[in-house]
């Protein structure tokens, strides 16, 4: 590697460029050729290597052949439907269950509008949106884990 000259931060032209936000990286370093020729291929090849490595180390099994006459005791949906499945399973009234299930995307739709006047991107400076996100994540994990358990242990996760 060659010797890299450090920029002179006392240079008024460079200070004006940095004040305007010009440049992609530190000190106004351009994205071409550094990012596009070095960082992006490394990230792409690293991602491909991770996927190939996981496919070799943990191959997915085909499983046993389907038998239409042997129905499992409880049919579970795909993992990303576990929280709403748990809502439908535990709420006694079907209409209330459907309304609660419909409130999930409506609640997600309102999250960007919480504190939208706040210009900060730091989560610690946006307490309402951060709290809603953390509580929503905890509830989704709780419902998702509970959906994999029997119905009598699903709400308490078998802890109580």
Swiss-Prot record:
Pfam families: Cytochrom_B_C. GO terms for cellular component: chloroplast thylakoid membrane. The keyword Ligase does not apply. Signal peptide: none annotated. CDD domains: cytochrome_b_C. Keywords: Chloroplast, Electron transport, Membrane, Photosynthesis, Plastid, Thylakoid, Transmembrane, Transmembrane helix, Transport. InterPro entries: Cyt_b/b6_C (IPR005798), Cyt_b/b6_C_sf (IPR036150), Cyt_b6/f_cplx_suIV (IPR005870), Cytochrome_b_C_euk/bac (IPR048260). It is a multi-pass membrane protein. One of its GO terms (biological process) is photosynthetic electron transport chain. It comes from the Eukaryota. Belongs to the cytochrome b family. PetD subfamily. Component of the cytochrome b6-f complex, which mediates electron transfer between photosystem II (PSII) and photosystem I (PSI), cyclic electron flow around PSI, and state transitions. The 4 large subunits of the cytochrome b6-f complex are cytochrome b6, subunit IV (17 kDa polypeptide, petD), cytochrome f and the Rieske protein, while the 4 small subunits are petG, petL, petM and petN. The complex functions as a dimer. NCBIfam families: cytb6_f_IV (TIGR01156). This is Cytochrome b6-f complex subunit 4. It comes from Acorus calamus. The gene is petD.
């Amino acid at each position: 590697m060659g010797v890299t000259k450090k920029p002179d931060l006392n240079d008024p032209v460079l200070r004006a460029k940095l004040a305007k936000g010009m440049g992609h990286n530190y000190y106004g370093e351009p994205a071409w050729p550094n990012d596009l020729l070095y960082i992006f291929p490394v990230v792409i090849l690293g991602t491909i290597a991770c996927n190939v490595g996981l496919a070799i180390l943990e191959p997915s099994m085909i499983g046993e052949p389907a038998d239409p006459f042997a129905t499992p005791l409880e049919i579970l949906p795909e993992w990303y439907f576990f929280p709403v499945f748990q809502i439908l399973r535990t709420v006694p009234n079907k209409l209330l269950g459907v309304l609660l299930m419909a409130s999930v995307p409506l609640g997600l739709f309102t999250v960007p509008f919480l504190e939208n006047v706040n210009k900060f991107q730091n989560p610690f400076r946006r307490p309402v949106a951060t709290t809603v996100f953390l509580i929503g994540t905890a509830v989704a994990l709780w419902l998702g884990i509970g959906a994999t358990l029997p119905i009598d242990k699903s709400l308490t996760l078998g802890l109580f």
